[in-house]
Amino acid sequence: MSDNIRRSMPLFPIGIVMQLTELSARQIRYYEENGLIFPARSEGNRRLFSFHDVDKLLEIKHLIEQGVNMAGIKQILAKAEAEPEQKQNEKTKKPMKHDLSDDELRQLLKNELMQAGRFQRGNTFRQGDMSRFFH
């Protein structure tokens, strides 16, 4: 089981999260109502928080202590969540980019032209092959 999966498993009830974060239940529910955290629900409809949720609550608490308002917190958290996606996109793009040598480029172009020629003709005969049948 990967570390990311473990950290996102809903384990903690609100009482434990209150002790870990030193936030009140009302504050935690308020952050949920404002879409800052998304705790899972148990079968009895009780909130269950993951390590990620606790980390996010601690980050929210730190931002509030610095004087950041709710709109600012939402922007900061949205930006922080978008950055890993951008980094992942950059990682997938980088392996595709590499400099081709002149010989590799010629071979690639030659193969593409040959493929294009096959599809444009629609048959496997060369022009010279057809002329034998008509002379």
Swiss-Prot record:
Inducing stimuli: Under conditions of nitrogen-limited growth, repressed by TnrA.
Region (Disordered): 80-101
A GO MF label: identical protein binding
Notes on how activity is controlled: Under conditions of nitrogen excess, the DNA binding activity of GlnR is activated by a transient interaction with feedback-inhibited GlnA. Under conditions of nitrogen-limited, GlnR is autoinhibited by its C-terminal region.
Traits of the deletion mutant: In vivo, this mutant constitutively represses glnR expression. In vitro, this mutant binds DNA more tightly than wild-type and this binding is not activated by feedback-inhibited GlnA.
DNA-binding region: 14-33
Record keywords: DNA-binding, Repressor, Transcription, Transcription regulation
Record has Transcription regulation as a keyword: yes
Protease recorded as keyword: no
Residues spanning the membrane: none
One Pfam family recorded for the sequence: MerR_1
Sequence ranges assigned to domain HTH merR-type in this UniProt record: 11-79
GO biological process: negative regulation of DNA-templated transcription
Signal peptide: none
InterPro entries: DNA-bd_dom_put_sf (IPR009061), MerR-type_HTH_dom (IPR000551), MerR_fam (IPR047057)
PROSITE patterns, per database record: HTH_MERR_1, HTH_MERR_2
Oligomeric form and interacting partners: Homodimer under conditions of nitrogen excess. Monomer under conditions of nitrogen-limited. Interacts with feedback-inhibited GlnA in order to stabilizes GlnR-DNA complex.
Extra facts: The amino acid sequences of the N-terminal DNA binding domains of TnrA and GlnR are highly similar, and both proteins bind to DNA sequences with a common consensus sequence. In contrast, the C-terminal signal transduction domains of TnrA and GlnR have no homology.
Role, per record: Transcription repressor that represses many genes including ureABC and tnrA, during nitrogen excess. On the contrary of the MerR members, which require longer DNA sites for high-affinity binding, GlnR requires a DNA sequence of 17 nucleotides as minimal binding site.
This protein's name: HTH-type transcriptional regulator GlnR
Record organism: Bacillus subtilis (strain 168)
